[in-house]
């Protein structure tokens, strides 16, 4: 869609991509059946889009740093990532969004700090789809940024939300068990 709308070229990276099952005849779009890595740094991008992938990566700092090293000195390259918003999961007791294949979870603050640590200047973070997802837009930083730790109030809030989530999930399970006993 991005390639079509802007008359652009696009390259997708997916280690599970099978061309025979996913035929594409879209002009300017091609797929690489591999994990993205620095060996693809010669793929010059104006825009790097990574949606609903980062939460599946255990070493997120290494991956985001790889993206940063790959775009090197191209200061005008914009990166856009989208991940589930853990704050919403905790706040709204959205336990159905805690998947076994998700090994990394983010709040707006933790996502921002990750990108700053990896050499990006964060342009903005937003929530999308009624707060279900976090998005971050960034570009390569022109200078080394200071590492900003989480504030104590943010840590306290997340701790309280996590404890509340645990308690409320237990209560929800008990309520469902009682409901099922009635059948």
Residue ranges and their predicted role:
Residues 8-14:
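Conserved SAM-binding motif I beta-strand of class I
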Residues 1-7:
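Conserved SAM-binding loop of SAM-dependent methyltransferases across substrates and taxa
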Residues 22-41:
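Conserved SAM-binding strand-loop segment of SAM-dependent methyltransferases
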Residues 79-104, 108-112:
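Short, glycine-/aromatic-enriched active-site segment of Class I SAM-dependent methyltransferases
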Residues 46-49:
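A conserved beta-strand element that flanks and buttresses the S-adenosyl-L-methionine
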Residues 61-80:
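A short glycine-rich, Lys/Arg-flanked "PGG" loop and its adjoining helix->strand segment in the class I
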Residues 53:
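Hydrophobic adenine-recognition pocket in adenosine-nucleotide-binding enzymes
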Residues 123, 131-175, 179:
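Flexible, glycine-/basic-rich loop-and-beta segments that form/coincide
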């Amino acid at each position: 869609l991005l390639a079509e709308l802007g008359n652009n070229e696009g390259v997708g990276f997916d280690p599970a991509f099978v061309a025979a099952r996913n035929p594409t005849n879209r002009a300017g779009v091609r797929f690489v059946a591999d994990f993205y890595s620095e060996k693809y740094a010669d793929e010059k991008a104006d825009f790097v889009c990574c949606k609903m992938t980062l939460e599946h990566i255990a070493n997120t700092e290494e991956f985001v740093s790889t993206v940063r090293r790959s775009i090197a000195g191209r200061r005008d390259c914009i990166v856009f990532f989208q991940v589930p918003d853990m704050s919403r999961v905790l706040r709204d007791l959205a336990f159905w969004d805690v998947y076994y294949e998700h090994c990394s979870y983010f709040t707006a603050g933790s996502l921002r700090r990750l990108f700053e640590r990896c050499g990006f200047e964060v342009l903005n973070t937003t929530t999308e789809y009624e707060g279900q997802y976090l998005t971050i837009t960034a570009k390569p930083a022109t200078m080394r940024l200071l590492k900003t730790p989480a504030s104590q109030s943010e840590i306290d809030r997340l701790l309280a939300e996590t404890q509340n989530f645990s308690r409320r999930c237990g209560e929800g399970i008990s309520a469902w068990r009682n409901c099922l006993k009635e059948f």
